[in-house]
């Protein structure tokens, strides 16, 4: 094997490594987007459950019926779990976005309320 063949193989290997690195970066971004969407949907689901419970309670009051006791929603626990998993729980445009390991004072304020 001569020098030009070795250099060509090395250049091809470098190009392949760069392509794999680029693909890995794209997959990482896509994974973060999917996880953020999942968190947003989980939070929306919790909000909808709360809304449904309020509707059922108001209808029961109108009809004079008693509702069976349900366990209260653990909203704070859910928010704490999401924050621990690395997502913003503060109000605003960061809500549901990945924190990338940094603490957020706004999120901590939400948890302390």
Curated annotation (Swiss-Prot):
Cofactor(s), by name: Zn(2+)
Keywords: Cytoplasm, DNA replication, DNA replication inhibitor, Metal-binding, Zinc
Cofactor: how bound: Binds 1 zinc ion per subunit.
Domain of life: Bacteria
Ligand binding (Zn(2+)): 88, 90, 104, 107
GO BP annotation list: DNA replication
Coiled-coil residue spans: none
Signal sequence interval, chain numbering: none
Transmembrane spans: none
An annotated GO cellular component: nucleoid
InterPro entries tied to this protein: YabA (IPR010377)
Location relative to the cell: Cytoplasm, Nucleoid
Similarity annotation: Belongs to the YabA family.
Assembly mode: Homotetramer. Interacts with both DnaA and DnaN, acting as a bridge between these two proteins.
Task of the protein: Involved in control of chromosome replication initiation. Inhibits the cooperative binding of DnaA to the oriC region, thus negatively regulating initiation of chromosome replication. Inhibits the ability of DnaA-ATP to form a helix on DNA; does not disassemble preformed DnaA-DNA helices. Decreases the residence time of DnaA on the chromosome at its binding sites (oriC, replication forks and promoter-binding sites). Tethers DnaA to the replication machinery via the DNA polymerase beta sliding clamp subunit (dnaN).
Name the UniProt record assigns to this protein: Replication initiation control protein YabA
């Amino acid at each position: 094997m001569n020098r030009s063949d070795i250099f060509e193989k090395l250049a091809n290997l470098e190009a392949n490594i760069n392509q794999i690195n680029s693909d890995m970066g794209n997959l990482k971004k896509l994974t973060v987007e999917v996880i953020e969407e999942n968190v947003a949907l989980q939070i929306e689901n919790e909000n909808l459950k709360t809304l449904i419970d309020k509707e059922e309670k108001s209808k029961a009051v109108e009809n004079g019926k008693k509702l069976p006791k349900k366990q209260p929603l653990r909203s704070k626990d859910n928010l704490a779990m999401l924050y621990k998993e690395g997502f913003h729980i503060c109000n605003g445009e960061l809500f549901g976005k990945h924190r990338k390991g940094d603490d957020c004072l706004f999120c901590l304020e939400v948890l302390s309320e």
